[in-house]
Amino acid sequence: MTLSVNLCSGAEALPTEQEAASLAVECIEPLAQLPHDLPIFLVGMMGAGKTTIGRGLARALGREFIDLDHELEARCGVRVPVIFEIEGEAGFRKRESTALQECTQRRGIILATGGGAVLAEENRRLLRERGIVLYLRASVDELFRRTSRDRNRPLLATADPRGTLNDLMIKREPLYKEVADLVIETGAMPITTLIKAILPKLQAYEKKL
């Protein structure tokens, strides 16, 4: 069963990804524990806040955080855009699926997946079967605002990046919802407030397992 949680009531703008990540690492203290050590997987569009929120959740829960894109970069020794340039999207997706298959076997982690990780049916199966999946959702306008200055997004290197985001959202959102146990509307809430709002939702969901 998928629960939809709207956490958009805050009025403050979400900091930049770099600022929010620093807040997550430096300011969030351990706040809670979950009854199980099931891994928590974050899915959603680029710019939805998977890395930032993932780091904050890991800090709050005292867990290890893994960013799948960063894991791929560490394995390949180059940035994601370079992998795309050399091997194309198909080559990147193959590497992504291999890394996902390995990372999802680890207990007690917070894993931020890439925006397109859900495209492969086998990846979706692994996410559903091996952990708790949070779909971090934001509007196309908010996604565009957050990614407009980011040059590390090869799929947005187009003449109309906002239109590309909209097309990707139409294609991918049904897949995010297919695997999601919880849908979290990230909105424009400060990262610390957002993390504190997500934690009780996770605790309530785990108690039902």
From Swiss-Prot:
Quaternary structure (record): Monomer.
GO CC terms: cytosol
Catalytic activity entry: shikimate + ATP = 3-phosphoshikimate + ADP + H(+)
Molecular functions per Gene Ontology: ATP binding; magnesium ion binding; shikimate kinase activity
GO biological process annotation, one example: amino acid biosynthetic process
PROSITE patterns associated with the record: SHIKIMATE_KINASE (PS01128)
Protein name, per record: Shikimate kinase
Natural source organism: Bordetella avium (strain 197N)
Enzyme Commission (EC) number: 2.7.1.71
Keywords associated with the record: Amino-acid biosynthesis, Aromatic amino acid biosynthesis, ATP-binding, Cytoplasm, Kinase, Magnesium, Metal-binding, Nucleotide-binding, Transferase
HAMAP family: Shikimate_kinase
Function summary: Catalyzes the specific phosphorylation of the 3-hydroxyl group of shikimic acid using ATP as a cosubstrate.
Location(s) in or outside the cell: Cytoplasm
Pathways per UniProt: Metabolic intermediate biosynthesis; chorismate biosynthesis; chorismate from D-erythrose 4-phosphate and phosphoenolpyruvate: step 5/7
Family to which this protein belongs: Belongs to the shikimate kinase family.
